Every structure is written in C-alpha cells, then in structure tokens.
C-alpha cells in the first residue's frame, strides 16, 4: 500500500514498526524499516463499540466496531468511521469516511480464511504552513493561509480487497495474503517561500499530482 494518501486508524488492531532487515519480509526492498498496519479481524465473540468525539475547531468524529459470531466456524466484523473537522488555519477543513467489513471462516482446527473489503474517502484542504523570515518562522498570525484554499484540495478514494489464508502445519503456520487495490487520488497545493526583505511580499509556488 505505497500510494500517498492519509490513512485512518479506525480499523487497525495495531501498528508494527519493523526495523532494518526485518522489513525485507514484505519484498518491497524496505531495508531501513517499514510500518506494518495490522487490520482488525473478526472475533469469535460478541463485540459492539461506538465512539463519538467532539473538539475544538469544529472537530466531529464517530467510529463503530461491530462483531458477531455466525455459527461455530464463521464470524463477521464491521468497522466504520466518519469525520468532519476544521482547523486553526483559515479555510482549512477535512471530511473523511471509511467502512471495512470482514468475514472469517475457520472450518477446521488450524485453518482460517479471512476476506475483507475497505472503502475510504478523504477530502481536505492542504495546509503547507506559514512563511519564513531570516531562517525562522515569520512573526505572523498563525491563522493566515498562504495561497488559495479553494485551489488546495486533496482528494482520495480508495478501494481495497483482501483474502488471507492461514494453515497450521505442526508447530508452523503457513500464511498467504492477496490484496487488490484501486486508488483515485488528486493533490494540489500552494507552498509559501521566504518573505521579502521588507516583509511585504511572499513568493508562492504551486503544483498538483494525480494517481
């Protein structure tokens, strides 16, 4: 999952930091290390959790984690998220949502098949900070946005499907995970440079990128 977009934590069990050569197990050439996101899987017990957050700068967020056991060998889990938040910076906001249903089937002892799908949508205004003067942040109002918020949009739509199979063989476990993903991403922003000597003008550069 190498595409550059803002990932959310709503459906993660944990994050593993694999340092040095350990990162090579993924076949990506990440010799310096990688962060491995471990997604939540169905449990063979009931679980129902809902969380709501309200905060400063119009922050609103809700998450849900629902799990159910279906018979003796099947379980399903549904994770969902929605967030809409502002910022201390003028014109900066974000809205994102995600849903991740998963199903686990364990027909035999030592055999487990897990199928999952995730849809994530993220739209926001890119915030590249304030200008600088003489090698340090300029003495300006921190709420100032340099550029045009209407032309600094970041958008991502992500669809990820996965199938994971585990088979115990004696004391060893054989694992195979297949992932198919589709990404629709656009990034555009303005970058403020250093202020002029008279502190009256700021040079702006801009670029965009689509995946």
Regions flagged by a language model, labelled:
Residues 3-6, 64, 88, 149:
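Short, solvent-exposed loop/turn positions at domain surfaces
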Residues 3, 23, 50-51, 150:
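Conserved short-loop catalytic and cofactor-binding motifs
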Residues 83-87, 100-106, 110-168, 173-210:
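Acidic/polar loop-and-plug regions of large Gram-negative outer-membrane beta-barrel proteins
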Residues 10-13, 24-101, 107-111, 159, ...:
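Outer-membrane beta-barrel translocator/receptor signature
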Residues 21, 41, 119-121:
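Short, flexible active-site-adjacent loop segments at beta-strand->alpha-helix junctions, enriched
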Residues 3-4, 55, 168:
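Structured loop/turn residues at secondary-structure junctions
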Residues 1-21:
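Periplasmic plug
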